Amino acid sequence: LWVKNGKSFLEIIFKQVEQQNVRLALMNSFSTDRETREAISAMRTAVCPLIFLQHHFPKILKETLGPVSWPKNSALEWNPPGHGNVYTALWASGSLDELLKNGIEYAFISNSDNLGAVLDASLLGYFAENGFPFMMEVAERTPSDIKGGHLAIRKKDGQFILREAAQCPEEELTAFQDIQYYRYFNTNNIWVNLPFLNRFMQQAAVLSLPLILNEKTLDPRDPDSPRVFQIESAMGAAVSIFKGATAVLVQKSRMVPVKKCGDLLLVRSDRYLLTEDARIVSNPDCKTDRITIALDPRYYGKIDGFESRFESGIPSLLECESLTIRGDVRFEANVKIVGGVVIENRKSGQTTVKTGSVVSHDLVL
């Protein structure tokens, strides 16, 4: 999957590593390991990453609270346990020992889909100079961040904690979403002191991170398959466990995640540039500070549907404040979106935004 200028996430990450001359480690899941190794082999890169495997947990049937049995595809009986598993997997695989033997004392950990998360020497210096065991990068919450996890302080001991929406009782959701009270969210960019982590894991063996129950369908492609719980944890939650852990406020430019096709549309657009040193940065020609994207999940929710509707190119979003697409709409080349726009197709078949169109107001096709 290419993300910018025909380059994949891995290609951009590897170029960043080459530019910064640092060691790269990858945590793969059981479902991504083979494809990742094949992609790296095809790249013919000089970078030789340390690769270790994430553990896998059984999916739990919501109805019985027992483990899933799915003979038609036994691989669907398991799920990766979230990125909170990184500490245990790193230690149990022997990879932590290998890094320490090679003189590596500090790790910067981020999601591979967040290409804004490059290693920053000033942050590394701050982390090392102060002797922190753990440091979480946080950014200021905006109205678009109300559903994401936020940083808080535990009253009984003053320790930082991370609270996710899935851990919040329904009656507290209003307070959870108050961005004036809970001002900072976790970017999921984490700094870890590896000698400290090694000592901790030797004593504890596992991290008792807060449990996250994600309710999903057993088969992601079959909405009628049984409802299950996936047991997961978040790596940022370690901020509540490591004594002396801290947080540092960073610019939002260090968080450019691609979780959904709407995020991919944004990063592929002219609002972002890929620099010579493989950084994803905001285009200085942007006329708007913020933008929201809402794509109809029926037609843009899967990558194949998304690609087919933008095969002629991504619209210019330099002057766009918001873009909402409802219905089946295909875009031809050199389309420009200006301001806040809703494009809606109320017909049963697909319709098209023609080549060279400038859409500056709501459009019903």
Model-flagged regions — what are they?
Residues 125-365:
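Left-handed beta-helix
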Residues 1-236, 278:
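Domain-scale recognition of functional cores that engage charged ligands
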